[in-house]
Amino acid sequence: MERKLMIAPSMGCCDLFDMERQVRIIDEKSDFLHMDIKDGVYVPSFGIGPEFLAALKDKVSTPMDAHLMIKHPQQYLETFAKAGAAYITPHTDCIEGAAFVTINKIKELGCKAGIALNPSVPLETIEYYLPLLDKVTIMIVDAGISGQKVIEQTYDKIRKLVKIREEKGLDFLIEADGSMNRDVYRPLYEAGADMVVLGPPALWNKADDFEEAWAIMENELESELN
């Protein structure tokens, strides 16, 4: 059976004046709901918060992934678990020194544990706790800064991670995140990514009407992979 490339739209990009309709469409058609949580400290921009997840918790059936681009994620694990996150994904450099404690806490809260690596972070950083993870997010641009070009060296990082997963018999998703567009679907798929995060360039900017934008995105994804 041919492997599918899963999609995770970044929900903070939804149009406030068309929010309910867009959420319903995304919930029906997506594999994950990607929630970018940014504090203006770890990254220079701001994102959505736990209230956003809590508002959707009983309205959606698709798993919500809280991508914590925040300096002190340990302080907010319980908050995001209660808000309805199925996955909680902090960054490696924000849990350094307490990685096992953080990952085990996420699991104790009933969530699946992810980890995110910026492009300059080597895979060796997560070697010892990789068996505990349910998802690894490979940032293909530096986190939290818009308008970047995809760093193509990250394709090799994904290939290496796929090899490690196979050799060790592990079971975690590999997600690619950052400046997603049709030109990188095939390279990421061929490298072994299981899922891609969709932002404005890949989805919302495709058309003024969201349903039309979604159809364009689907056609681009299909044409690039076939």
Show where each model-derived region lies.
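Structural motif
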Residues: 28-29, 59, 83, 109, ...
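Hydrophobic faces of well-ordered beta-strands that scaffold small-molecule active sites
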Residues: 6-11, 33-35, 56, 64-68, ...
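Conserved, mostly hydrophobic/aromatic
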Residues: 19, 36, 80, 136, ...
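N-terminal active-site wall of soluble small-molecule enzyme domains
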Residues: 34-105
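Glycine-rich, proline-tolerant flexible connector loops at the mouths of alpha/beta enzymes
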Residues: 33-48, 141-149, 204-206
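Catalytic cores of alpha/beta
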Residues: 22-23, 74-82, 120-131, 178-196
